[in-house]
Amino acid sequence: MSSAPTDAFFRTPLSERDPEVFAAITQELKRQQDQIELIASENIVSRAVLEAQGSVMTNKYAEGYPGKRYYGGCEFVDIAESLAISRACQIFGCSYANVQPSSGSQANQGVFMALLQPGDTIMGMSLAAGGHLTHGAAPNQSGKWFKAVQYGVRQQDSQIDFAEVEELARTHRPKLIIAGGSAYPRTIDFARFRKIADEVGAFFMVDMAHFAGLVAGGVYPNPLPHAHVVTTTTHKTLRGPRGGMILSNDADIGKKINSAIFPGIQGGPLMHVIAGKAVAFGEALKPEFKLYAKQVVDNARALADTLVRRGLDIVSGGTDSHLMLVDLRPKKLTGKAAEASLEHAGMTCNKNGIPFDPEKPTITSGVRLGTPAATTRGFGVEEFKKVGELIGDVLDGLAANPEDNSAAEARARAEVAELCRRFPIYQ
């Protein structure tokens, strides 16, 4: 009896091959169609990106780099990766790109391996101030392998405390200074960071995972003229598949990063994901992407303004980007309770600590909201004003009825459903 796959192996659809997984995917599609996604780190990719990521390139091993592989049969995956590299360089105005990191965290780890030795000092924004785990937080590898110094924000306005940055840099002489974060809503003065880095002889790295798409769209400052190296995810505002990327204009750093990614921390790259990255980068080069990026920021400001009118505080007083931190203390609510109630109303977000938060990280005094995904659906300023009113209604209901907010949630959920019907996805 032959052990070779039968014709059914190549023809049987997922719905028949594995009904349980198919059901989970179908239910997730319905969730995305029927809920307003307000998680700042999430977006909705095009059908073209989905097709590329679900392609036969998932079958191919391709250790190495285009033209220098350790496997045969790479001529076509080389095309996809070369397109991703050249398009990334065109988008961000740089001479080097590595598109192989499988996540933003691995992109950061690749930079650390290329430029640092265990025990070196790094400096990044503290998690409590809006930074990211991989910028030196104690539970993360970056906080275990390196001496991590953390800067924060000013108490009066929740913006980067450059006096503290300068003092810490001069005191600790870090080898690497990191700018960027996961919950910082304002533009960052990259030139000032670079000046501080040069003064103490440090490399300057920008993690633009959250705002890369805004840079691509021309509505947020480009860090490449200032940073030695830039890392990013390829999803979030860039609207590609989940993955990472490293950019630079320094050829020597590029060579070190290539070695750090492969063979340093990764083996075979995910070629189906890289194909999806190439498609997304091609989309980001089109004129309509600039309109999208501008709309993301316009929508964020409209949402923030509406929430302020509804009696909520916005950390730092507003936003220059796609995200905002909402301080719930004026309503005497926690982020944990608000996240749950908003999800019951059909609006997905995440609880998030705010600067100088008195609550535990598992509870928090705030929520983080973002506009990229709903903007991709087609929401404009008026729709986001409506979303802000719905959030206000749900939170007011929760403040009045903390044990049972089902009535306010149901009213909001009906209006959320109507908005989602007006702006469908994947029909």
Swiss-Prot record:
Keywords: Amino-acid biosynthesis, Cytoplasm, One-carbon metabolism, Pyridoxal phosphate, Transferase. The modification N6-(pyridoxal phosphate)lysine is found at K236. The keyword Transmembrane does not apply. The keyword Nucleotide-binding does not apply. GO terms for molecular function: glycine hydroxymethyltransferase activity; pyridoxal phosphate binding. Its EC number is 2.1.2.1. It is found in: Cytoplasm. Homodimer. PANTHER family: SERINE HYDROXYMETHYLTRANSFERASE (PTHR11680), SERINE HYDROXYMETHYLTRANSFERASE 1 (PTHR11680:SF35). This is Serine hydroxymethyltransferase. The lineage of its organism: Bacteria, Pseudomonadati, Pseudomonadota, Alphaproteobacteria, Rhodospirillales.
